[in-house]
């Protein structure tokens, strides 16, 4: 029915052209968006496999459809590997995204109107940690904690004070733009004091945690969620894990299916299983160590050049660059760097006077550049080029000079060998 010779190029040249253009963009641009990474050809092969054809509502051994014997093997491998990799007692690999993983936890553990304590968006939290436009801020009574104005670090005293005042049913720890080590045990102690459930969203640092480069929350939190891309470098998807608790596991599984999703994406789950196996290889720890070294090298250059790095450095894969002092908007900086083939994302910074669509900062991450082979010297050079552009906003000559250097280093360090 489907000959092997069938191709996208012949049938849909418009889509093929867009794919090829994106391949060129990824090869010729430097990727500094902290939530992005490059998936291996093995991961992409799984996502393009015949597993995409199979509907498999339910869980391994307990499906609502027949013919699931092979996808049962795939999903169980993913579950077992996730538990082994992170030291969890149970895992649900079906969430389609990190946001849906978090949504399932909310649905499983809370009722509408319950109080949730999470990090505010402008302090580095995620939409699903109680932001007003998100379901977590609309369905639940969201109380937000932030950073210490002097240190740029999480204000644990504020967290404890808010917890005592508002008695949240659940406390959410984790972030999308925080560059330091989180004291998971401090959150545990606060949660225990007020009788709250502790959810940790480690989406950004899961790869670092898997490699032992960043402290693990899995044995501390009641429930841990993550994505499988970002620092893990796998397919786009979500994962929920926890300590031994049959009650919590059952609630979570029911909230994922049938509560929030129907059929799982078994081709993506296969890719997750491969990603977990990749993270168990000897070279993965070296990669994650280099991710941190490269982020620290870049942050150091910005500080030396007089830019403000929130919390004055980084202990993970990302950092926030505040441009308030330079009176440059994140939107303008993002656009200028984009013209030099450097991809970043504008980001709100603590006490940002500008709107979330404009912002006064940039979020910079090192997973992608490290994946393609950047070392500290390359990272420092790159940070210097970014400084050159930011110090000469509007100078297209500087942008063109940097763009040439970017293309040279990208050619030297390709993402996918041809």
UniProtKB/Swiss-Prot annotation:
<keyword id="KW-0554">One-carbon metabolism</keyword>
<dbReference type="InterPro" id="IPR039429">
    <property type="entry name" value="SHMT-like_dom"/>
</dbReference>
<dbReference type="GO" id="GO:0035999">
    <property type="term" value="P:tetrahydrofolate interconversion"/>
</dbReference>
<comment type="pathway">
    <text>One-carbon metabolism; tetrahydrofolate interconversion.</text>
</comment>
<comment type="function">
    <text>Catalyzes the reversible interconversion of serine and glycine with tetrahydrofolate (THF) serving as the one-carbon carrier. This reaction serves as the major source of one-carbon groups required for the biosynthesis of purines, thymidylate, methionine, and other important biomolecules. Also exhibits THF-independent aldolase activity toward beta-hydroxyamino acids, producing glycine and aldehydes, via a retro-aldol mechanism.</text>
</comment>
<keyword id="KW-0963">Cytoplasm</keyword>
<comment type="similarity">
    <text>Belongs to the SHMT family.</text>
</comment>
<keyword id="KW-0028">Amino-acid biosynthesis</keyword>
<feature type="modified residue" description="N6-(pyridoxal phosphate)lysine">
    <location>
        <position position="230"/>
    </location>
</feature>
<feature type="site" description="Plays an important role in substrate specificity">
    <location>
        <position position="229"/>
    </location>
</feature>
<dbReference type="GO" id="GO:0030170">
    <property type="term" value="F:pyridoxal phosphate binding"/>
</dbReference>
<feature type="binding site">
    <location>
        <position position="121"/>
    </location>
    <ligand>
        <name>(6S)-5,6,7,8-tetrahydrofolate</name>
    </ligand>
</feature>
<dbReference type="GO" id="GO:0019264">
    <property type="term" value="P:glycine biosynthetic process from serine"/>
</dbReference>
<dbReference type="Pfam" id="PF00464">
    <property type="entry name" value="SHMT"/>
</dbReference>
<dbReference type="InterPro" id="IPR015424">
    <property type="entry name" value="PyrdxlP-dep_Trfase"/>
</dbReference>
<dbReference type="GO" id="GO:0004372">
    <property type="term" value="F:glycine hydroxymethyltransferase activity"/>
</dbReference>
<feature type="binding site">
    <location>
        <begin position="125"/>
        <end position="127"/>
    </location>
    <ligand>
        <name>(6S)-5,6,7,8-tetrahydrofolate</name>
    </ligand>
</feature>
<keyword id="KW-0663">Pyridoxal phosphate</keyword>
<protein>
    <recommendedName>
        <fullName>Serine hydroxymethyltransferase</fullName>
        <ecNumber>2.1.2.1</ecNumber>
    </recommendedName>
</protein>
<dbReference type="InterPro" id="IPR049943">
    <property type="entry name" value="Ser_HO-MeTrfase-like"/>
</dbReference>
<dbReference type="InterPro" id="IPR015422">
    <property type="entry name" value="PyrdxlP-dep_Trfase_small"/>
</dbReference>
<feature type="binding site">
    <location>
        <begin position="355"/>
        <end position="357"/>
    </location>
    <ligand>
        <name>(6S)-5,6,7,8-tetrahydrofolate</name>
    </ligand>
</feature>
<dbReference type="InterPro" id="IPR015421">
    <property type="entry name" value="PyrdxlP-dep_Trfase_major"/>
</dbReference>
<dbReference type="InterPro" id="IPR001085">
    <property type="entry name" value="Ser_HO-MeTrfase"/>
</dbReference>
<dbReference type="GO" id="GO:0005829">
    <property type="term" value="C:cytosol"/>
</dbReference>
<comment type="subunit">
    <text>Homodimer.</text>
</comment>
<dbReference type="InterPro" id="IPR019798">
    <property type="entry name" value="Ser_HO-MeTrfase_PLP_BS"/>
</dbReference>
<comment type="pathway">
    <text>Amino-acid biosynthesis; glycine biosynthesis; glycine from L-serine: step 1/1.</text>
</comment>
<keyword id="KW-0808">Transferase</keyword>
């Amino acid at each position: 029915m489907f000959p092997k010779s069938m191709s996208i190029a012949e049938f849909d040249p418009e889509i093929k052209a867009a794919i090829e253009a994106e391949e060129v963009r990824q090869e010729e641009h430097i990727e500094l968006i902290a939530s992005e990474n490059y998936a291996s050809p093995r991961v992409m092969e799984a996502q393009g496999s015949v597993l995409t054809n199979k509907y498999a509502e339910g869980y391994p051994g307990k499906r609502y459809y027949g013919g699931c014997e092979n996808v049962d093997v795939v999903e169980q491998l993913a579950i077992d590997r996730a538990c082994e990799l992170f030291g969890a007692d149970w895992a649900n690999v079906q969430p389609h995204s990190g946001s849906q993983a978090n949504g399932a936890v909310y649905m499983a553990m809370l009722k509408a109107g319950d109080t949730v304590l999470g990090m505010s968006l402008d302090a580095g939290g995620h939409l699903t940690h109680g932001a007003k436009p998100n379901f977590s801020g609309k369905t639940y009574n969201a109380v937000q904690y932030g950073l210490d104005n002097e240190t740029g670090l999480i204000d644990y005293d504020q967290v404890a004070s808010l917890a005592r005042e508002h008695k949240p049913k659940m406390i959410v720890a984790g972030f999308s733009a925080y560059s330091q080590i989180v004291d998971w045990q401090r959150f545990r102690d606060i949660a225990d004091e007020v009788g709250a459930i502790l959810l940790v969203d480690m989406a950004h640092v899961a790869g670092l945690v898997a490699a032992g480069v960043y402290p693990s929350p899995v044995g501390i939190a009641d429930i841990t969620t993550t994505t499988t891309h970002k620092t893990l470098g796998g397919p786009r998807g979500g994962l929920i894990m926890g300590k031994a608790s049959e009650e919590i596991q059952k609630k979570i599984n029911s909230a994922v299916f049938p509560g929030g999703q129907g059929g799982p994406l078994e081709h993506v789950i296969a890719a997750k299983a491969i990603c977990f196996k990749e993270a168990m290889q000897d070279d993965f720890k070296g990669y994650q160590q280099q991710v941190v070294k490269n982020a620290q090298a870049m942050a150091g250059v910005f500080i030396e050049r007089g830019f403000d790095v929130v919390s004055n450095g980084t202990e993970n894969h990302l950092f926030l660059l505040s441009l308030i002092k330079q009176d440059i908007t994140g939107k303008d900086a993002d656009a200028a760097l984009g013209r030099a083939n450097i991809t970043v994302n504008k980001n709100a910074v603590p006490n940002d006077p500008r709107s979330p669509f404009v912002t006064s900062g940039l979020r910079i991450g090192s997973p992608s550049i490290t994946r393609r082979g950047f070392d500290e010297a390359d990272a420092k050079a790159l940070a210097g080029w970014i400084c050159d552009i930011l110090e000469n906003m509007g100078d297209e000559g500087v942008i063109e000079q940097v763009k040439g250097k970017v293309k040279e280093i990208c050619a030297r360090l390709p993402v996918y060998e041809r």
